[in-house]
Design a protein with these regions (language model features):
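Alpha-helical interface subdomain recognition
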Residues: 1-81, 202-340
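Short clusters of hydrophobic/aromatic residues that line enzyme substrate/ligand-binding pockets
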Residues: 29, 87, 164, 189-190, ...
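FAD-binding core of flavoproteins
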Residues: 82, 95, 103-218, 222
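N-terminal glycine-rich flavin-associated loop
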Residues: 85-101
Length: 340
């Protein structure tokens, strides 16, 4: 099986990467850290016009109709560029709205006219009806929230969450709130029997984590090549070069596993869940470990606010916990492996 991207896929990724580098550079995260939203409305519409939210949406629903492995490559690029904003929530929400027959809402989300917050259940609760305590990501300006669960996915009127309590996120590129819901009915409900959105969401989160891992490795390697001590690049030392190689290998393994998980999910393989859990486990570890190792390669500079590498570590911790605690995911992965 060839897991290498083809020429057309590389063109899509290159176009997205150029746009993100120019319009959403990493420097914006620090500059806009006190803004209500990480991405201004006009810029968000530009992202939508480029097709960043609808790459995998059916053409009849206004999307590009590309496969999930193309979406994976896009989300890897989003991770590499440390792209802020509700890319994951809006990509999934446009799909859920279309599958539930709400073409108007799907079009508004896909065009960037409406944004959707991602609501993550913390602790005990339920998704139908909606009840429990939730963390909401990028709720400012959103009219709806997306709740992704194993049994199905809900699009919910964000007013159903009641008063939102602001949460200070460690990542300056993310806006968070928390809310406790007694009971609320979703606007749209897409059961897992109709489409496995939880698995799709987990694969795309793994792809973003893969991008973070790759970017952290690239930053550290470039620094090791150019930073000199005693007249030599620090990369000549085995402790540094071995760390950089390990980081590159971890990022490559994460990309291969995530692409394979996407193919397994799209093909309806019996081991699709195993592959999805493997992807988010491998990618999550690669992202966190690479960013942490990158800070060490940068030395004292890696701990400063002006350096980018710590931003990758903070974002990795957020995405790693979106659709399941890592220890729970690992336990289920081991159980799945024994059952194969």
């Amino acid at each position: 099986m060839n897991l290498l991207p083809g020429p057309e896929q590389l063109e899509i990724v290159a176009a997205a990467g150029e746009f993100l580098a120019e319009r959403l550079p990493v420097e914006r995260i620090r500059a806009n850290r006190h803004a209500e939203t990480p991405v201004p409305e006009a810029l968000w519409r530009e992202c939508a016009e480029l097709g960043l939210l609808t790459l995998g949406l059916d053409e009849e629903s206004g999307g590009s109709g590309r496969s999930i492995d193309d979406e994976v490559l896009l989300f890897i690029e989003l991770g590499k560029r440390l792209a802020s904003g509700p890319f994951l929530a809006c990509t999934l929400a446009a799909r859920v709205a279309a599958r539930c027959g709400d073409a108007a809402l799907s079009e508004r989300i896909g065009s960037g006219a409406a944004t959707v917050a991602l609501a993550v259940l913390r602790g005990d609760g339920d998704v139908r009806p909606i009840k429990g305590t939730f963390d909401l990501f990028e709720p400012a300006g959103a009219l709806h929230a997306l709740v992704v669960a194993r049994e199905g996915t809900a699009l919910v009127d964000i007013a159903s969450f009641g008063p939102l309590t602001a949460v200070a996120a460690a990542d300056p590129g993310i806006r968070m709130c928390s809310a406790t819901v007694e009971s609320a009915e979703p606007l749209h409900w897409l059961p897992a029997e109709d489409e496995r959105i939880w698995e799709r969401a987990t694969v795309l989160a793994a792809a973003y984590l893969t991008g973070l891992a790759a970017a952290a490795a690239a930053l550290a390697t470039q620094h090791a090549k150019t930073r000199e001590q005693f007249g030599k690049p620090i990369g000549v030392h085995q402790a540094i070069k071995h760390a950089c190689v390990d980081m590159e290998l971890a990022a490559s393994a994460a990309q291969a596993q995530t692409l394979f998980a996407a193919i397994a999910l799209a093909g309806g393989r019996v081991d699709a869940l195993l592959q999805v859990l493997s992807a988010v486990t491998v990618a999550g570890s690669a992202a966190v470990d690479n960013a942490a190792a990158g800070i060490q390669v940068f030395g004292g500079m890696g701990y400063t606010f002006e350096n980018d590498v710590h931003l990758y570590l903070k974002r990795a911790h957020v995405f790693r916990h979106l659709f399941g605690e890592p220890t729970d995911v690992l336990a289920e992965l081991l159980a799945q492996d024994r059952a194969q």
